[in-house]
Curated annotation (Swiss-Prot):
It is an enzyme of class 3 (hydrolase). The record marks 87 as: Stabilizes the basic form of H active site to accept a proton. The active site is at 19 (proton acceptor). One of its GO terms (cellular component) is cytoplasm. This is Peptidyl-tRNA hydrolase.
Amino acid sequence: MKLIIGLGNPDPKYQKNRHNVGYMVVDKILENLRLKINKEKFSGIFVKTEEFIIAKPTTYMNLSGDFVKNISTYFKVSPNNILIIYDDMSYEVGQAAIKPKGGSNGQNGIKDILLKMNTEEIPRLKIGIGKNQEAAKHVLSDFTLEEFKIIDLVINQAAEAAISFLFNDIRIVMNSYNK
């Protein structure tokens, strides 16, 4: 069983924020696979098939850890079979990277997940949102029109990479999508 989780904030006012790029990728995955979220449990929403689960926490970004811990424990998904998709300020808009493990790099949602899961051995797909001196304000700002043209392409590529993760080893996905 594989589990893909896109991070974001549930309030509609944050829908187009940089911090919600994980949600945006999950929406694209669902669209590409012609699936719809149909379950709500563990403070999150998800769809489950026989092979995989695609999910979004319904807590705010910085409190994502309990959802990841609870859904992965309940469905017996090991950390190496989870892919967390989230925004990363250390990458420019238009950049993305898949990593098999690592620290939080200051991203509070992933920091909470690593704390609650008690491991850094969780694959992740980082989507660049650019840097700014005022981090809190920046992550809660919307992409500019020019940036959104770029991020839309990245969201499509990230969705393809995440779908590939459902059926392949993380190393294969990394070799195909990290360029």
